[in-house]
């Protein structure tokens, strides 16, 4: 998709609906940034954040207050599922309310084929189409934090007096192959 000229360059089944995995985290970031009212918020990784679906792990320490900005960084750079769940709990609403906000935002953006059931993308029930994801990417371009974090090759996450090194899950970003406006990988 060419954002400059607002046109499709090439497509194959652009409206086909399928699971979107961690691309979900772009919506999580948008909803968090728009709804969090506490600039100094912190959250801890807890047992509630455990990945019972795929058994993924986190490099972040459990039961340690971590700033929401650092969790956002861990989520967008390293695609940390636990950070996504912790962020959804820290935006001043329940996890279920947060997911409802994600679905409301999708409808607001005209993403008719999109449904979210969790904030990390672990569930195969998070579905969308390529054309809907173009709408999400275009919307995400308005958030400098999302653009900057999704394009970082690596980062240090400050967590409880520790500095945790993480790499971007996107090899094209890590190796600086090209410069894209917004990046996010997803794997089912």
Residue ranges and their predicted role:
Residues 1-131, 135-144:
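Active-site-adjacent loops and short helices of periplasmic peptidoglycan-processing enzymes
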Residues 111-112, 125-188:
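Domain-terminus/edge residues, biased toward the C-terminal soluble/receptor-binding domains
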